[in-house]
């Protein structure tokens, strides 16, 4: 996962044109942040800056950048080469601000040991949740919310298995949802079908680790950022003062919103950016 910031007063057009023409679709996913659209004096309807939020004894930071990439590769050598290629395409108007390698853990589990993304929509429902259907240059595009969460696994492991299950609202061993889980359980705070209208998202959580920290990179693809934001506000207790149990051992340290442009033929379509 890469984020790039724009150099103040730099013109991003030439770099974005090279990126449009040179970004191979099998490299991964590309997202454009509101600062880039603003610099181009273009409006991408529905795109906005990630909000910094606060709730009872918890907070959600905004670290909005100009561009985000989620690259795929079988090894770090491939990812290194792709990163260098993107930096070369972007040129001097963008600077790599952050890079985090993520990985697949224990059959798709979070580092806490619990399965994640269990209730992702599938097939047509996934398309409806994540893909914009507007009759303009946005058709076929998507919006994405990206957060990095940092876990305190030592604290989490100090809880009993029942306490850990109550935080998540699921049994770790069976992944079965606990019917009488507390209102603060993550499955209850984030139940996408409980919103009006429903807030279904196509979510992906990828573990990460450095020498002294670890956690998950949370990625949610949506046809409208309102879907993600409604869930996030409930998680911090903005609706009823009840904070998601995740905050007992984890906290978000980054947050950004991005627009993933549609595809025309074999390349990205930047027409909504005037490019």
Regions from the language model: what does each represent?
Residues 1-275:
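Long, histidine/aromatic-enriched segments associated with O2/redox biology
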């Amino acid at each position: 996962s890469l984020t790039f910031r724009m150099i103040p007063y730099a013109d991003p057009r030439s770099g974005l044109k090279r990126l449009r023409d040179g970004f191979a679709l099998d490299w991964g996913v590309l997202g454009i942040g509101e600062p880039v659209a603003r610099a181009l004096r273009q409006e991408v309807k529905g795109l906005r800056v990630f909000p910094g939020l606060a709730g009872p004894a918890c907070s959600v930071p905004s670290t909005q950048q100009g561009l985000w990439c989620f690259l795929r590769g079988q090894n770090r050598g491939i990812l290194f080469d792709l990163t260098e290629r993107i930096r070369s395409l972007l040129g001097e108007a963008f600077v790599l601000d952050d890079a985090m390698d993520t990985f697949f853990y224990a059959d798709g589990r979070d580092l806490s040991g619990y399965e994640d993304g269990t209730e992702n929509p599938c097939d047509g429902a996934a398309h409806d949740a994540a893909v914009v259907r507007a009759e303009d240059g946005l058709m076929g595009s998507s919006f994405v919310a990206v957060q990095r969460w940092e876990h305190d696994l030592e604290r989490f492991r100090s809880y009993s298995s029942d306490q850990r299950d109550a935080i998540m609202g699921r049994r770790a061993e069976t992944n079965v949802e606990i019917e009488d889980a507390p209102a603060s359980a993550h499955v209850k705070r984030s139940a996408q079908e409980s919103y009006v209208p429903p807030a279904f998202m196509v979510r992906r959580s990828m573990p990460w680790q450095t020498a002294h920290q670890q956690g998950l990179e949370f990625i949610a693809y949506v046809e409208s950022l309102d879907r993600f934001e409604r869930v996030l506000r409930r998680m911090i207790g903005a609706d009823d003062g009840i904070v998601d149990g995740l905050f007992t051992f984890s906290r978000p340290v980054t947050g950004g919103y991005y627009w993933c442009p549609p595809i025309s033929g074999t390349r990205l379509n930047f027409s909504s950016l005037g490019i």
